Amino acid sequence: MNAQAVAAALSAWGRLKRALFLALGLMFVFVLWRSERFIVDHSHPDWAYYAPVLWWLVPHGLGGLIALVTGPFQFSSRFRQRHLSWHRVMGRCYLAGIAVAVPFSVYLSLTHATLAFRFFLLTLAGAWLFTTAVAFVAVLKGHVQIHRQWMVRSYAITTTFVTTRVLTAIPSIGGGGEVIYVPAQWSLLVATMVLAELGLTWRALFAGVRPSMQNQSR
């Protein structure tokens, strides 16, 4: 594979990454309007259901929001190279957001979800905490590449904060009852993690080729 092909592949990956973050942003706006409006609009049908656990739900939501917003900056090589100190600050904010969101999500899962959905939510919370903890330990030990790989896995799970709500907005899924939407969310989680692994493989393959191509051109 020549240097031009490698450069084209990396450029395509950069464009795809920007497109994914744009799509995520649009989905987030949709979710705010459709699923979270009850927080300020108490006439919304969901208000009566969530009002008893509002003060558990808000910290969970804010923690997830912090992770969701700060995450994309962690994957920008340009931002990391130009603003390393800010990269680290935002990384700490990302960790803090998840550290807040996970305990509240566990409580909400145990008290406000059916058994089948509870198992999914607890698995999601455990995977979110585990992937983030591995990324954190890796960077503390100086294993930057491993840190980046696990951050991708962690952020993939973070995106389910949005994508699962978009999924249940589909009438045939959200209105189909637990027997439909719980398997659908499991499928979405698996697909999300598979896509994350494919992205890691793509990036590692061409990032690994690029230095050798540069050496050959000298």
Residue ranges and their predicted role:
Residues 1-218:
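Alpha-helical membrane insertion/targeting regions
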